[in-house]
């Protein structure tokens, strides 16, 4: 079956973060090179802590973002929730993509955080705030993220999210192998 999407499809992104929006745009245009998309970011709550501190809380945040984006904007063909979190000494993100009939999910690669960053997290709002403090950056979470700092810009938040989003799109790029899983 072809991966082509013919008409303009609205992709509702449950974030206004430029790094997340860039990753979603990149993944969709890569997965569907003949597709035409309109990408719309919306500010919706994750209903979890600003800095989720477990895999399950992070996953729930991504699911909640999709649910809340659907409630906010009923006109989407796709809804994308991305939630970054920490579990132990690693950070990662969950990607959830839904249409009206399908859901795809994937977790990004994980990266270890320095001990001095981990030590400061209990008194911080989000990892990005601690990274800015420790590394002397400003608003890193909306740029390359912790991963760009720790890999000397070999990877960025958007590049790692791009890969995870491509994986979350598998049910949509291979619909003949994935029956509808939403009712």
From Swiss-Prot:
Going by the record, the broad EC class of this enzyme is hydrolase
Its EC number(s): 3.6.1.73
Record GO terms (molecular function): ITPase activity; metal ion binding; nucleotide binding; ribonucleoside triphosphate phosphatase activity
Q: Please give the Gene3D superfamilies that the UniProt record associates with this protein.
A: 3.90.950.10
Source domain of life: Bacteria
The alphabetized list of GO BP terms reads:
nucleotide metabolic process; thiamine metabolic process
The cofactors required by this protein are: Mg(2+); Mn(2+)
What does the record give as the reaction this protein catalyses?
XTP + H2O = XDP + phosphate + H(+); ITP + H2O = IDP + phosphate + H(+)
Q: How is the cofactor bound?
A: Binds 1 divalent metal cation per subunit; can use either Mg(2+) or Mn(2+).
Q: Could you list the residue ranges forming a coiled coil in this record?
A: none
Keywords, sorted A to Z: Hydrolase, Magnesium, Manganese, Metal-binding, Nucleotide metabolism, Nucleotide-binding
| Binding locations of substrate | 75-76
InterPro entries to which the protein is assigned, alphabetical: ITPase-like_fam (IPR029001), Non_canon_purine_NTPase (IPR002786), NTPase/PRRC1 (IPR026533), YjjX_NTPase (IPR050299)
Report residues binding Mg(2+).
Answer: 75
Biological role stated in the UniProt entry: Phosphatase that hydrolyzes non-canonical purine nucleotides such as XTP and ITP to their respective diphosphate derivatives. Probably excludes non-canonical purines from DNA/RNA precursor pool, thus preventing their incorporation into DNA/RNA and avoiding chromosomal lesions.
Which family does the record claim for this protein? Answer: Belongs to the YjjX NTPase family.
Question: How does this chain assemble?
Answer: Homodimer.
Q: Which NCBIfam families match?
A: inosine/xanthosine triphosphatase, PRK05074.1
What HAMAP family does the record tag this protein with? Non_canon_purine_NTPase_YjjX
Name used for this protein in its record = Inosine/xanthosine triphosphatase
Provenance organism: Vibrio vulnificus (strain YJ016)
């Amino acid at each position: 079956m072809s991966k082509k999407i013919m008409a303009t499809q609205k992709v509702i992104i449950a974030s206004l973060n430029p790094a997340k929006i860039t990753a979603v745009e990149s993944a969709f245009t890569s997965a569907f090179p003949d597709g035409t998309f309109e990408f719309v970011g919306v500010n919706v709550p994750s209903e979890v802590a600003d800095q989720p501190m477990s895999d399950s809380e992070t996953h729930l945040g991504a699911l909640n973002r999709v649910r809340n984006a659907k409630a906010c904007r009923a006109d989407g063909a796709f809804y994308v929730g991305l939630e970054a979190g920490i579990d132990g000494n690693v950070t990662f993100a969950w990607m959830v993509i839904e249409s009206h009939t399908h859901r795809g999910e994937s977790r990004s690669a994980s990266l270890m955080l320095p001990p001095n960053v981990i030590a400061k997290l209990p008194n911080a709002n989000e990892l990005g705030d601690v990274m800015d403090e420790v590394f002397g950056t400003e608003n890193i979470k909306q740029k390359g993220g912790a991963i760009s700092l720790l890999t000397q810009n070999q990877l960025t938040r958007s590049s790692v999210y791009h890969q995870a989003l491509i994986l979350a799109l598998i049910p949509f790029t291979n619909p003949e192998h994935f029956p509808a899983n939403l009712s």
